[in-house]
Amino acid sequence: MIVRTTDDITGTERDVSDGTWRSKRIILADDAVGFSFHETTIQAGSVNEFHYQYHVEAVWLVEGSGLLTNLETGEEHPLKAGSMYLLNGHERHRIRCDEQMRMLC
């Protein structure tokens, strides 16, 4: 059994940021459970591009709003608290963050 809090992660090597986003990586590959789990916060007013080549990513937006764009098809999806998206095809995508977003993924 693994039990952690975000306070346990804060300020460690599992607390990663890149200017406009911050990811608290609660479960990682070295935990040997076959998946990862993160709490990610993205700053309002930012635009970020992401691409996960080696894993499927499920994202549940618990706070905030913005726009998700599939960069391969141009398809756009409005996001708000309660939205979920699944990147099961390793899609390159962009997140435009209108209100600060907090995601569990």
Regions flagged by a language model, labelled:
Residues 27, 43, 62, 80, ...:
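Residue-level detector of conserved, well-ordered beta-strand and adjacent loop positions
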Residues 11-13, 23, 37, 65, ...:
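Short, acidic/polar N-cap/turn motifs at the starts of alpha helices
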Residues 21-23, 36-53, 89:
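Conserved short histidine dyad/triad with adjacent acidic residue
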Residues 80-83, 89-105:
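Ligand-binding loop in jelly-roll beta-barrel domains
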Residues 34-36, 55, 100:
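A structure-centric signal for secondary-structure junctions around beta-strands
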Residues 47, 52-53, 58-81, 91:
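A short beta-strand-loop-beta hairpin characteristic of the jelly-roll/cupin
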Residues 1-35:
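A short, N-terminal "cap"/entry segment at the start of jelly-roll beta-barrel domains
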Residues 37-41, 58, 76-78, 84-86, ...:
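Conserved hydrophobic/aromatic beta-strand scaffold that supports enzyme active sites
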